[in-house]
Amino acid sequence: MDNKLFWTLSAEGNEVLRDLSKENEKFSIDGYNKGDFDGNNYQWYEMFHHYDFDDNGCDYERYGCYIKEGDVVLDLGANIGVFAHRAETRGASKVICFEPVTPTFNCLIKNKGNKTLVYKNAVGGKQGFTTFNIHTDYTHIGGGTSHLQDLNLSNKNIIHSEKVIIIGINEIFEGFESKINFMKMDIEGGEVDVLTSISDDNLNSLRCLSAEFHKTYEMFDEFQQKFIDRMVNLGFKYFVLYYGDGRLRTLNFWKE
């Protein structure tokens, strides 16, 4: 694997070039929980050294849900580009990234490989606008959430806020000539809008879908089960991995 240096964000929002692969040699979950490592370290661990519940080192690739040589990969919530780098090292022929938040997008531009395309948009059910916030500090790189999700989650210290353009999920599928094989989604609570709106034809065109789900409201589990049933009806197999108290979970879907 290419030992690529990555542009990351410090707690204060400064861009810092780091060797996340080398830092990972000393990484531990206990150390992360104690503050010895930050969200950038955890993201590298999650993409390259996870190995939990039969994944192949990446939480988004498990059982039959994995990137094949030549795949076109759609990365929704690309952040600074660690998963996109993973996809390229796995042999993807093209990686299409969407990331709405300016500080992380600026790092993504610098980190992207030759096979990666980047777009500064949020992704939703249809075109529009929303406000995205980063809370706590800039190493909280999973914290770029829409204003609506912030209201649903909790009152946190907002350190960055910006209005962003939303592009509809079906427009993405219709806007690229290349067939998308693998879709990864980590959009911090926006998955309900996207997965409710995506057409059966576009879902069915995928071989794999891997998504991080966030339980942001009481009836979320009902939505999740309906979506699982929908995917099963389209011929997908699936696996759900719950974390901690169960509010955060990873769902892997694949066709054999």
Identify the residue ranges that each predicted region occupies:
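Phosphate/nucleotide-binding beta-alpha loop and adjacent structural elements of enzyme active sites
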Residues: 1-256
